[in-house]
From Swiss-Prot:
Name assigned to this protein: Bifunctional protein FolD
InterPro entries reported for this sequence: Aminoacid_DH-like_N_sf, NAD(P)-bd_dom_sf, THF_DH/CycHdrlase, THF_DH/CycHdrlase_cat_dom, THF_DH/CycHdrlase_CS, THF_DH/CycHdrlase_NAD-bd_dom
Catalytic activity from the UniProt record: (6R)-5,10-methylene-5,6,7,8-tetrahydrofolate + NADP(+) = (6R)-5,10-methenyltetrahydrofolate + NADPH; (6R)-5,10-methenyltetrahydrofolate + H2O = (6R)-10-formyltetrahydrofolate + H(+)
GO molecular-function terms, A-Z: methenyltetrahydrofolate cyclohydrolase activity; methylenetetrahydrofolate dehydrogenase (NADP+) activity
Species of provenance: Bordetella petrii (strain ATCC BAA-461 / DSM 12804 / CCUG 43448)
Classification via NCBIfam families: PRK10792.1, PRK14186.1, PRK14189.1
HAMAP family: THF_DHG_CYH (MF_01576)
Similarity section: Belongs to the tetrahydrofolate dehydrogenase/cyclohydrolase family.
Length: 294
């Protein structure tokens, strides 16, 4: 796998979609909205809850808290031991639900095995569910009336919009059917007028599906699962994956070296979707605060 930073030009002509640069512009807009709220006496607040000591989760949480502080949001990080009981976590979430200084609550996944992610997510007040995972928010998204859009799919849509990618009538293929990325991604693309195919681990002849895609979104957690032979010439390729390769370097679910020879545009790893996910978390938190401010 070849690491490709957003600042490095693609030698074969595939346009690099610079998620880091777009995320910076979004964070600057968030900072302006935070200042406008301050004039009303409101400071957007985000609580990030981490259970256990998973190294990757610690990095994600640290990045989210740092982004909040840089944009002027109030943020608190609560870290608990892996042996915390589910009841204790639910009680803490209930307290945060009732805290008027907190507009958004994020529980970092995955949780320890003895906890039900579904039960924990459902405990978060829907109006503070800035991840967009609560069943109420999933239903609103399904009907085209989202309160919060899940951060990663929301970020992908902003990238496609910024790149001027035509979605109406386009063939969009999503590899990965998770509740966090794949399913909400399908809903957002469908609402934009694309024709959707969702592939999962049971899909027969995956390459035949991906080669039809004008827009290909890959979110499997499997390094290099998609290579250039599986991509339609000129397609827009969005790599949601972030993995550690055998060499210890970050890599995506798409083999960048071969994909860039075929794609018309492609997101790098790192510097692509990751920064956008955090940027859209800030957007959702500010929107939650704006609703309370009236």
């Amino acid at each position: 796998m070849t690491r490709q930073d957003a600042s490095t030009p693609a030698p074969s002509g595939a346009r690099i979609i610079d998620g880091a640069a777009l995320a910076q512009r979004i964070r600057e807009d968030v900072a302006r909205r935070v200042q406008a709220l301050a004039a009303k006496g409101v400071r957007p607040g985000l609580a990030v809850v981490l259970v256990g000591d998973d190294p990757a989760s610690q990095v994600y949480v640290r990045n989210k808290v740092a982004a909040c502080e840089k944009a002027g949001l109030y943020s608190i990080k609560e870290q608990y031991p892996a042996d915390m009981t589910e009841a204790e976590l639910l009680a803490r979430i209930d307290t945060l639900n009732r805290d008027p200084a907190i507009h958004g609550i994020l529980v970092q996944l995955p949780l320890p095995p003895h906890m039900s992610s579904h039960k924990v997510i459902e405990a978060i007040a829907a109006e503070k569910d800035v991840d967009g995972f609560h069943i109420s928010n999933a239903g609103l998204l399904m009907t085209g009336q989202p309160l919060f859009r899940p951060c990663t799919p929301y970020g992908v849509m902003k990238m496609l919009e910024a790149e001027g990618v035509p979605l109406r009538g386009a063939e969009a293929v999503i590899v990965g059917a998770s509740n966090i990325v794949g399913k909400p991604m399908a809903m957002l693309l469908l609402q934009a007028g694309a024709t959707i195919t969702i592939c999962n681990s049971k899909t027969r002849d995956l390459a035949a599906q991906t080669r039809r895609a004008d827009v290909l979104v890959v979110a499997t957690g499997k390094p290099g699962m998609i290579d250039g032979s599986m991509i339609k010439p000129g397609a827009v390729v969005i790599d949601v994956g972030i993995n550690r390769g055998a060499d210890g370097k970050l890599c995506g679910d798409v083999d960048f070296a071969s994909a860039r020879e075929v794609a018309g545009a492609i997101t790098p790893v790192p510097g692509g979707v990751g920064p956008m996910t955090i940027a859209m978390l800030l957007v959702n938190t500010v929107e939650a605060a704006e609703r309370t401010a009236g």
